[in-house]
Amino acid sequence: MAGSCPFLANIEAQERLSEARYDDGISETFSGGAGLVQVSMVVFDQDGDAPNSAGLSTLFTTFGQFLDHDLVLTPEDHDEGVLDLVGMPHEIARSAVADEIDDGETIAPTNVVTWQIDGSQVYGSTEARMDDLRSFEGGKLRVQDDTTSASEMLPDADEDSFMAGEISGDDPVYLAGDIRANENPNLLSLQTMFVREHNHWADKLAEEHLDWDDEQLYDAARSIVEYELQQITYNEWLPHLVGDAVGEDTGFDTNETGEVSVEFSTAAFRFGHTLVSSSIDRLADDGTDEGSMALMDSYFNHSPVEDSGIEAIIRGQLSATAQELDTEIVDDLNFFLETPEGVSGFSLAAINLARGLDHGLDSYINVRAQLIGDIDPDTLDPTDFSVITSDESVQARLASVYTDVFQVDLWVGGLAEDAIEGTQMGPLFTHIIADQFTRTRVADETFGELDPALGDAIIAEVQTSTFAIIIERNTDVDMVQDDVFIAED
C-alpha cells in the first residue's frame, strides 16, 4: 500500500522507547501470549452504558481520533505476511516495516504521515494530495455546497483518490488530507469544519492583504490552522487526559526527534477506543433529538452528514458524554467493527492486541519496569494482579485470561491502571503520552509560531481562537460551552 499510493509518503520508522519482543528477536510475532479473541471478549466486554465520570464529551473522543490521524498512519503490507486471528472473519495483513532497517535487525513499523501537529489530516502529507485538495483560487481549499444548508462540505473523492471506504455514485466518499476521514460521521464533521476554518482565514487574509497571491494566502491560512490545532491540543485537550504531565513549552531542541513511538501509536494512544459510545447523536438547533444512529451502522456511512449537515452532529458531540476510560469497549467496536471493504464482525480490541504482537510490544510489566522503573519484575508475585490495578473486578477478569501478571499485554495493562488523580490515565500511559507530546513540540522548530506578516489584528484574533470559537464561526451551532471537551446539555 505504501509503495503504490502516491498520497502516502514521509515513510519513517517509528521510535522504540522499550525493547522489542519477537520470538526470533527480529520479526516473528511473540507466541507466548494469551488468546487475543478471548482477552477481547472477557476483559473488554461492556454491559450497558458507562458514562465518563469526569463528564468528557464525545467531542473529546473525536478530537483524539482527529489528532491521531495527524500524527500517525501505519499501512498494511501483505508482503510482510498476515495475522491469523482465530474467531475473526479473516486474517489481517501485517504492518509495513521501515526500509531503513537492515537485514538481521529488529523490524519497526512505518509512519507514512508527518509526525508534527501540522494539519496533515486536513491538508495531506504529500504534494499530490495537497494539490488535489486546493482550489488554487484565493488560497482556499476545494469545497462543495451542502444541500442541507448554505454551508460548505468536502469535495467528493474519485477512484484515484485513495480514500478508505467504498466509492460509489449513491454514497460518495469525501476527499480529505487523511485517507481515514470517512470512517464515521463524528470524525467527518471535524474534517469538514477545519476545511471551513482554513477558508475563513483565506478570505479574511485576502481582505487584509490585497497584494497577496493564492500561494501566500494558502500558506498563511494553513499556518493559522496549524497553530490553532496545536493550541487546542496542548491547552484544551491534553490537560483533561494527562493533567500537567506534558509541562511547559521549553522551545526547540535540536537534539530531540519527534517521530512517533511504537508504544504510543500501538498502545497508549489507542485509549480512545474505550471512550467511544454506541451511537452517533444528532441534535437540532433547539436541542431536540434529530435521531441517533447505532455506531455499528455508521462505519463509512455519510447519510447523517448528508441528511443533517455537520451542525447536528457537532451539537450531539457537545452534548453527549463519552464512555469511561477503562478496559471495556462497546459491542459496536468489540463485536461488529467493519473494515473499509465492508467486512463486518471484527473485534477492535483483538485487532489492537494483534498489532501489539505485530509491532513487537513487550508486556505491560516489562515496559513499565523499563520506562518508569517503579517495579522489579524479579520480585513480583506472578499471581498478584493488584500490581496493575486496585479494581478487584478487573483483577479477576485479567486473572481469568492471563496465566500471570507477566503475560498481560501493554495495551491492556495501561488501560487497567488506576488513573492519576485529576486525569484519565495511569502512570505508564501518562508517561508514554507525555513523552510523545513533549517531543512532538520541542522537535518542531516552528511549533506555536505565527508569522508577523499576518498583521497584528489577525494574530490577536488567532491567539484568542478557542475550539468553541472555531465551532461557532464555522457552523450554525450557537451557545457552545467554553470547554467543549466537557459535555453539556
Q: Where are each of the predicted segments found?
A:
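N-terminal accessory/cap region of cofactor-dependent oxidoreductases and related radical enzymes
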Residues: M1-H200, K204, S223, Y227-A350, ...
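Inter-helical turn/loop segments and adjacent helix faces that build the functional surface
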Residues: W201-L217, A350, A354, I375
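Short, flexible coil/linker elements and helix-boundary hinge sites characteristic
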Residues: H209-L210, L380, Q407
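Alpha-helical scaffold segments that form or flank carboxylate-/histidine-based iron centers
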Residues: L217-S223
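Flexible, acidic glycine-rich loops studded with aromatic residues
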Residues: L371
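Short linear, low-complexity motifs centered on an aromatic residue
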Residues: P377-V401
